Amino acid sequence: MTAIAPVITIDGPSGAGKGTLCKAMAEALQWHLLDSGAIYRVLALAALHHHVDVASEDALVPLASHLDVRFVSTNGNLEVILEGEDVSGEIRTQEVANAASQVAAFPRVREALLRRQRAFRELPGLIADGRDMGTVVFPDAPVKIFLDASSEERAHRRMLQLQEKGSSVNFERLLAEIKERDDRDRNRAVAPLVPAADALVLDSTTLSIEQVIEKALQYARQKLALA
């Protein structure tokens, strides 16, 4: 009988710290990593590379089904590898972002990418970062964590990130954008942003990232009986 690889899902709103936590857990456990938020950008970039029309659902479905992408976390940095090439920076361009929003609108593309995401489930295990990993993509995952934080704290973290990059930011505007996105995500008809019924809800508002990582790893190891 073939062993089924365990999955740890990390869901939650934007700015809660999911990416940092997932990278740390993948490195600590030496497991595979899936950044579901980057998948649509990677597909959009692949379409641009192969001159596939991003407005054609029929053309995009086979590309989505066989998307050659890997996520590698090294020393806290996430590398996105498309067809053997590091495209971590390239997927963050505005051109790719615009194309990604187009490809994400097609139901058959979303279905193909759902199957592609599930194919990341390989031994020794998978850390899956997203918004509906525990509810839609891996509903049978043995460990589910919903990482949350207050909208004010998430706006504060985002402001610090932008300031470090030299950007001038308005806290009130950031907070309003986060609240608007939260409302949209939590009330959408398909795959709303809600914790799975069997998820550990971990509030990181008053915790350091080190404390969040420690709590998440401790919970996962207990659930999976890992040493």
From Swiss-Prot:
Enzyme class label: transferase
Keywords: ATP-binding, Cytoplasm, Kinase, Nucleotide-binding, Transferase
EC number per UniProt: 2.7.4.25
Any single biological process term in GO: pyrimidine nucleotide metabolic process
Gene Ontology molecular function, alphabetical: ATP binding; CMP kinase activity; dCMP kinase activity
Disulfide bonds: none
Domain of life: Bacteria
Transmembrane keyword on record: no
Residues holding ATP: G12, P13, S14, G15, A16, G17, K18, G19, T20
Primary residence: cytoplasm
Transmembrane segments: none
Statement: the UniProt record of this protein carries the keyword Phosphoprotein: no
Catalyzed reaction equations: CMP + ATP = CDP + ADP; dCMP + ATP = dCDP + ADP
Gene Ontology cellular-component terms listed: cytosol
Subcellular localization: Cytoplasm
HAMAP family: Cytidyl_kinase_type1
Similarity comment: family membership: Belongs to the cytidylate kinase family. Type 1 subfamily.
Stated name of the protein: Cytidylate kinase
Underlying gene: cmk
